From Swiss-Prot:
Domain of life assignment: Bacteria
Pfam families according to UniProt: LIAS_N (PF16881), Radical_SAM (PF04055)
EC number(s) given by UniProt: 2.8.1.8
Organism: Ehrlichia ruminantium (strain Gardel)
NCBIfam families: lipA, PRK05481.1, PRK12928.1
SUPFAM superfamilies assigned to the protein according to its UniProt record, in alphabetical order: Radical SAM enzymes
Cofactor: [4Fe-4S] cluster
Binding site for [4Fe-4S] cluster 1: 34, 39, 45, 273
Record family assignment: Belongs to the radical SAM superfamily. Lipoyl synthase family.
Keywords from the UniProt entry: 4Fe-4S, Cytoplasm, Iron, Iron-sulfur, Metal-binding, S-adenosyl-L-methionine, Transferase
Catalyzed reaction equations: [[Fe-S] cluster scaffold protein carrying a second [4Fe-4S](2+) cluster] + N(6)-octanoyl-L-lysyl-[protein] + 2 oxidized [2Fe-2S]-[ferredoxin] + 2 S-adenosyl-L-methionine + 4 H(+) = [[Fe-S] cluster scaffold protein] + N(6)-[(R)-dihydrolipoyl]-L-lysyl-[protein] + 4 Fe(3+) + 2 hydrogen sulfide + 2 5'-deoxyadenosine + 2 L-methionine + 2 reduced [2Fe-2S]-[ferredoxin]
Name used for this protein in its record: Lipoyl synthase
Organism taxonomic ancestry: Bacteria, Pseudomonadati, Pseudomonadota, Alphaproteobacteria, Rickettsiales
Listed GO MF terms: 4 iron, 4 sulfur cluster binding; lipoate synthase activity; metal ion binding
């Protein structure tokens, strides 16, 4: 594994708020993608009491080459998880919550109904909490999109992850154009939902391919693009082709804004839910500015 440049080095997580978050997640038996995916920003986010909760168990039915989440035979659904999540959100007095999940190809609706239950339970306790969901692709789950659109999350996020040329190597069980279809259809069914998608760089993609992904996402009416450095979790995962410089990330940000995105987050350590609450407020302001 290649040694990381200085701009990718982060401090070990510490602090009372960090341990409070960890203990609360354990108390409510909740998984977080922060831990399962070994996110480099966990210390910063948890000290701000920001966390991305991972529902539908901790075992994924796929084994993407970039992802550190365990794969195999998935857990049984916890019918109490939506209520446990709502209690945790209330205990932490969160104003914005991000919910993601493993892929659940074994479930008839891919877990879409469980997402809906989580949204409903949180809003029962506090209708002012804003909710962002980061979902799998619900491939061949025909009712999933309708369920999600009707539930009306404030932000709908689904990551395309990489350029289409690399899908066979990096995301072999997914389909690039299905992901675009999913994002576009959610927006068509409920135009008030903000849509968001992310891509990793440093996997061997070309700049021109990144620009094409930007164009494809804008054609799907995606509001917000996230661009971050791929980091190899273990020796068994896809190898980092190169470390993209901060200056290159700034260039991608400039290009993305020029293509019409309402929001762009681009940087070496940027991840899908990094600064999610602050970015949601900026999204609202940027949309409002379009109509003034």
């Amino acid at each position: 594994m290649k040694s990381k440049p200085d701009w990718l080095k982060v401090k070990m997580p510490t602090g009372s708020a960090f341990y409070e978050m960890r203990n609360l997640m354990k108390l409510h038996k909740l998984n977080t993608v922060c831990e399962e995916a070994a996110c480099p920003n966990i210390g910063e986010c948890w000290n701000k009491k920001h966390a991305t909760v991972m529902i539908l168990g901790s075992t994924c039915t796929r084994a993407c080459a970039f992802c550190n989440v365990a794969s195999g035979i998935p857990d049984k659904l916890d019918p109490h998880e939506p209520q446990s999540l709502a209690k945790a959100v209330s205990s932490l007095k969160l104003q914005h919550v991000v919910i993601t999940s493993v892929d659940r190809d074994d479930l008839e609706d891919g877990g879409a109904g469980h997402f809906v239950e989580c949204i409903e339970e949180i809003r029962k306790r506090d209708s002012n909490v804003t909710i962002e969901i980061l979902t799998p692709d619900f491939l061949n789950k025909h009712d999933a999109i309708d369920k999600i659109a009707k539930a009306f999350p404030d932000v709908y996020n689904h990551n395309v992850e990489t350029v289409p040329r690399l899908y066979a190597k990096i995301r072999p069980k997914a389909r690039y154009f299905h992901s675009l279809y999913l994002l576009k259809t959610i927006k068509q069914k409920n135009p008030r939902i903000f849509t968001k998608s992310g891509i990793m760089v440093g996997l061997g993609e070309l700049k021109e391919e990144i620009y094409q992904v930007m164009d494809d996402l804008r054609s799907a009416d995606v509001d917000f693009i996230v661009i971050g450095q791929y980091l190899q979790p273990t020796s068994k995962h896809a190898v980092v082709d190169r470390y993209v410089t901060p200056e290159e990330f700034d260039h991608y940000k400039y290009v993305a804004y020029s293509k019409g995105f309402l929001m762009v987050a681009s940087g070496p350590l940027v991840r899908s839910s990094y600064h999610a609450e602050e970015d949601f407020q900026r999204l609202k302001k940027n949309r409002a500015a379009m109509y003034t």
